Amino acid sequence: MRRVRVARHRGTTAHLASIYPFLAEAGLGHRGVYLGTNLLTGGGGFAYDPFEAYQQGLVTNPNMLVAGEPGLGKSSFVKTFTARALAIFNGPDTIRRWVAILDPKGEYTPLAEHLGLTVIRLYPGGTSRINPLDAGPLGDPAQREELTRRRADLVAALAGQVLRRDLDPLEDAALGWAIQTLSSTRTLAQPTLADLVGVLRNPPPTVATRVHLAPDVLARRLDQVGFALEKLLDRSLRGMFDGPTTITVDPDARGLVLDLSVVHHDDDALRLVLLAATAWLQTTLARRDGIHRLQILDEAWRLLGAERTTRYLQACWKLCRDYGVANLAVVHRLSDLRAQADDGTTTAKVAMGLLADTQTRVLFRQSSDQLDDARHLLGLNPVETDLLGRLTRGRALWKVAGRTAVVQHLIAPGEAAFCDTDTSMRP
């Protein structure tokens, strides 16, 4: 038999990795929070921090997405990542961290107690109230235009959420002018939603003239918007958003948790509360003081059901680099990112834009009916897609701007108490 001679070829692992993507992954380096072991590097340690990754040029934005079915370690990862980041980045040679957590289910209280975070519970008739129209650090006259735009975008999103439709051109324009009028009034440097409803009910001549309508005619045209905003001031949300903020945010503390669990089982109310609370936090975090801030938005999928709310969230994401804020969104299923809309709709396209502004994706196991969405939305190859459906508890597929890791997340003994979300299921 004639022997076949094949020319010898020598190549690097970088070339081989293009043939089989999981071969000899180099890892992301050691800078950041230690999270566990990277199974693609032979079990070496895995560390990550979105701000460090941004500074190294690994990503162009510090935002993160965490997705996974319940009970597979998603919540434990978020909590341990937060606790370790606050512990590590607290020395003289590091940039200090500050965290804000939107907690729809009330499950972050043990973590808050462990870290010394302030817990603020919002509930009807309670003593804590936030004003979504707060100026915060944007109260500087030089930033008035940005503040007015933010307020107008927020209120349009809130009204659209209640009305289940986008505002018509007249409503949109009149709303913006009403906010502009309030924002320019010295006695109302911090206008409230109640103030805005009052202007919509009795439009000043300056607003009515701009739309070429008599004030009483304009008031009737804005009735639906006024009723929509009043939903935030009455009934199940009474006392939560109907006046000036009663909460003092201490920038020298470690952070805060907004407990929204009282409205968790009311989907419509929770969407409004999440949106209003997110707006208040975004304004509160808009400080150029050199501190890196992490905003955690649990159950973020609830804000992706309408174009206005999705656009507002995307605008917040885009501002992250300006103020040193990393947004961490938590969802269950990757299909949530389609904004509960058919492919091709404007809302779905905006949600895809939001995903593009989130370059760090931490993916715990997804059910088989979610794998096609994962492949399509995240650009996973066949090997990664198959792996995503077979990950065990505590193990996640990481995608960092095209880089891949499979990480076994580790929980230290001292962290188990604030990671346990199954206490109500045990006798």
Model-derived features: positions:
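P-loop NTPase motor core of the ASCE superfamily
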Residues: 143-191, 342-427
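Basic- and hydrophobic-enriched, low-structure N-terminal and domain-boundary segments
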Residues: 1-67, 414, 426
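Short, well-ordered loop/turn elements at secondary-structure boundaries
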Residues: 29-30, 41-43, 60-61, 81, ...
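P-loop NTPase motor domains
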Residues: 17-40, 109-117, 132-325, 387, ...
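Conserved P-loop NTPase motor cores
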Residues: 52, 59-72, 77-82, 96, ...
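Short helix/loop capping segments that flank catalytic or ligand/cofactor-binding pockets
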Residues: 46, 56-58, 75, 110, ...
